[in-house]
């Protein structure tokens, strides 16, 4: 779904303090020492719930979002949420993940910038973390999700589900905390990035960093319309080519006759020649 703005687009799509919370709930889960070094002195997590937890907490399902997702897995595009839930057709009463039966939890991942601590959050010095935000791993992210699980007093998830980068976190759960899940549902994911994925993503990173408005990652205080939108747009175009099938790409971008013209007619070629 495309998002339209009446004026220049905001410098960032991140949720920030003071924005409408929407359906988000928040919990502070303490400090974390990170796998690659460094630490975060306090981690706040934004999460949403759907359905009702039963008396013995046996009907809980955890949903893992992909790289650019958030906690809004289901629900309307209301205050605090620019779009409908990204799995809105799957989660709800009578749907595949039936909230008449299941209690569903989805949290914004560590570093995700949609309410959970990330580069757009305020650092202890009062500035946005921006370029100073430390590197985090899937292991760090799942550690925070495990703390959220403990906070919610859920002993074992009936299932954990996720696709893409979310699927990587599902796999991490299965490896690190197998006694805390009954089943794992991994969609379009892998235990590690392949060489071609690393190569493509390095090109995406270069596209973003080459945008002068990237400002080395410290662009949060810029005015509307002055963010790294061009670089991000190019990176997104790269991304669109990496998770589409050949058939779909042909439908979207394949050669096609223009304006109902017959490319084999004599008049078509005369017209095309004159226009050169």
What are the language-model segments listed below?
Residues 107, 185-188, 241:
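Alpha/beta-hydrolase-fold catalytic nucleophile elbow
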Residues 126-132, 139-159, 178:
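Conserved acidic catalytic loop of the alpha/beta-hydrolase fold
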């Amino acid at each position: 779904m495309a998002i339209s703005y009446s004026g220049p687009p905001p410098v960032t799509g991140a949720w920030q303090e003071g924005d409408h919370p929407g359906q988000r709930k928040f919990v502070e889960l303490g400090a974390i020492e990170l796998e690659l070094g460094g630490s975060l002195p306090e981690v706040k997590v934004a999460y949403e719930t759907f359905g009702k937890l039963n008396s013995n907490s046996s009907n809980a399902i955890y949903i893992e979002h992909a790289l650019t997702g958030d906690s809004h897995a289901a629900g309307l595009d209301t205050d605090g949420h620019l779009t409908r839930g990204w799995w809105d057709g799957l989660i709800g009463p009578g749907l595949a993940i039936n909230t008449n039966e299941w209690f569903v939890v989805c949290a914004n991942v560590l570093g995700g910038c949609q309410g959970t601590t990330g580069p757009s959050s305020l650092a202890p010095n009062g500035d946005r973390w921006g370029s100073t935000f430390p590197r985090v791993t899937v292991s760090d992210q799942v550690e925070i999700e495990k703390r959220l699980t403990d906070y919610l007093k859920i002993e074992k998830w009936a299932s954990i589900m996720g696709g893409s980068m979310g699927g990587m976190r599902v796999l991490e759960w299965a490896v690190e905390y197998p006694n805390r899940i009954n089943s794992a549902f991994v969609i379009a994911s892998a235990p590690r990035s392949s060489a071609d994925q690393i190569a493509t993503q390095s090109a995406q990173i270069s596209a973003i960093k080459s945008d002068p408005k990237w400002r080395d990652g410290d662009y949060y205080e810029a005015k509307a319309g002055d963010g790294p939108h061009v670089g991000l747009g190019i990176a997104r175009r790269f991304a669109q080519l990496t998770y589409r099938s050949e058939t779909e790409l042909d439908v979207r971008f394949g050669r096609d006759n223009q304006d109902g013209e017959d490319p084999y007619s004599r008049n078509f070629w005369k017209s095309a020649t004159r226009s050169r």
